[in-house]
Amino acid sequence: MARTTPIERYRNFGIMAHIDAGKTTTSERILFYTGVSHKIGEVHDGAAVMDWMEQEQERGITITSAATTAFWSGMDKSMPQHRFNIIDTPGHVDFTIEVERSLRVLDGAVFVLCAVGGVQPQSETVWRQANKYSVPRMAFVNKMDRTGANFDKVVEQLKARLGAYAVPMQVPIGAEDGFEGVVDLLKMKAIHWDTASQGTTFEYRDIPADLVDVATEARSFMVEAAAEASEDLMDKYLNEGDLSEQEILSGLRERTLKVEIVPVFCGSAFKNKGVQAMLDGVVHLLPSPADRPPVQGIDEDEKEDTRAATDTAPFSALAFKIMTDPFVGSLTFFRVYSGTLNSGDQVYNPVKSKKERVGRILQMHSNNREEIKEVRAGDIAAAVGLKDVTTGDTLCAQDKIITLERMVFPEPVISMAVEPKTKSDQEKMGMALGRLAQEDPSFRVKTDEESGQTIISGMGELHLDIIVDRMRREFNVEANVGKPQVAYRETIRKSDVKSDYKHAKQSGGKGQYGHVVIELSPMTEEERKSDNVKDDFLFVNDITGGIIPKEFIPSVEKGLRETITSGPIAGFPVVGVKVKLVFGSYHDVDSSEMAFKLAASMAFKQGFAKASPVLLEPIMKVEIVSPEDYLGDVMGDVSRRRGVLQGQDDSPSGKIINAMIPLGEMFGYATSLRSMSQGRATFSMEFDHYEEAPANIADAVTKKG
């Protein structure tokens, strides 16, 4: 089957923002204007198409990235048809993983900002993630109809807080209740959308007299930004004082693709104004898969390899999300980077070294689906029937193997015990948690060997609340949850601490003999960056002359690695330690892998105790937005929680307080902040780093452990 849309007319982009910027409403309007959705869904009434999980509709926040395919031929229907694959991403910090995984497979992003709130703490987190993957992006300043809306202020914040070279493509006509439309700086015309048709029709008018000077100045700034793309454009601009519409677009596009500039649009998704022109901007300014560099990976011989975004190249794709669907079972969302795949084809998963047959291929439209026969380079789709694929795995052609770079997922910082309410929930709970962990790599499940309890770990309280909620709704499992527990770590402060341990048992028959001498030191920053570091632990073999035979060295390392999973202080994982194997001895008959494993384990425990062991606690970067009236109470409370204030900023809702606070002090903070501020203050937090816990905390944790 021939390709219906050339790859140059594909746009794979994400819609990103902080909570309450109006991201889901913006996505809804996109679906409405591209003809996918015949009725506009509102978040207020829980009918939004993109927020398809029950909990999302109840809580009014987006949790999982829903992928949708739509088509666009321009606001005035004059463009050739473009194919959009849109991914809606959550804005809550506990779901940063969803943003991260969608960024990995996108070519561009639309950054939605609130015209009142501007650049929020969460915006900075999302922006940093987009920088990490060099994602070209444009901004849409939403909610221009709201009281306090200020387009210029948000553009300034983009520059000051995010370091973006923001280039307005429009200026708003009016603001708040008086917001009427926008001035298109390319055409130097005012755009007015028709209210009766919900914005599906529009007309160009002359620019209002009071905006002519503002628009002229803004246009000069835009043209200058375009001219800086190349010497030819700059020469023409300097000689003639202007550029054609086509030249401006080509210069701006070139610079957007290089992530040098961020074009800025504005509107009110809720009032059906502005999203339409922003979609034209997606076509003009964001990349197609063919504009992005070829995807990089490693071939069978561990050599670097690339795949160009063409249908004729060997097939390669990245599985970026696994979901459990009530009707079809497990769905694997994947992005095709090169080649073609037909339903029924076999694919190879080099990460698991397994072949799998792709059953059905589904094109997803939020929670509706359409079955398709094939996918090609640039497509995003979902496969049914893949059993062993996990998030971040590569799928490729069996005869041309490539392993694409895996995704890096953050370590969970909070844990809690869960237990089934009834015997019949017991079995179902294990299956439910297994499925949910397969879907979400930032969520972990383990069994505590001593207590036999099931421990779940995640990125924050909300994250774990929603997991427990999903168990109930999707798997009918009722569970009791314990108090959240902090994921502490253990490490040492003293360097070059020697520990000598001989494991010897000789009581007739074959004995056991393993003898090791190790040196423990804290890892340096340099060492932490080395390729040999795994799980934040470095093993160095300094044995020469066969004092310990080569075949026993891996057993020594294995013994050490097994021991660091549960540290000697309170049973938390050991991090940041380098162990050097410096000496030892062996017995021709009695030495075995097990004996050396045990010797290494005991030597480590004894050495750790002598090396000034300390407990580390996770420190969270917390941003609190509070009205001035409550500032004293809020800041006093931060100090009581052992918080360190990092500074303050102004915000339309009062003051933004930045602080570093230990996670152990943050449980139940949402409730106490609400009561302190009569529900008017908000906060967001993300993990920042580990640091040494004070002695009283370490003692309390040790006693509990």
UniProtKB/Swiss-Prot annotation:
Record-given protein name: Elongation factor G
Pfam families attached to this UniProt entry: EFG_C, EFG_III, EFG_IV, GTP_EFTU, GTP_EFTU_D2
Binding site for GTP: 17-24, 88-92, 142-145
Domain tr-type G stretches: 8-290
Disulfide bonds: none
Name of encoding gene: fusA
Function: Catalyzes the GTP-dependent ribosomal translocation step during translation elongation. During this step, the ribosome changes from the pre-translocational (PRE) to the post-translocational (POST) state as the newly formed A-site-bound peptidyl-tRNA and P-site-bound deacylated tRNA move to the P and E sites, respectively. Catalyzes the coordinated movement of the two tRNA molecules, the mRNA and conformational changes in the ribosome.
Keyword Protein biosynthesis: yes
Region annotated Disordered, chain positions: 290-309
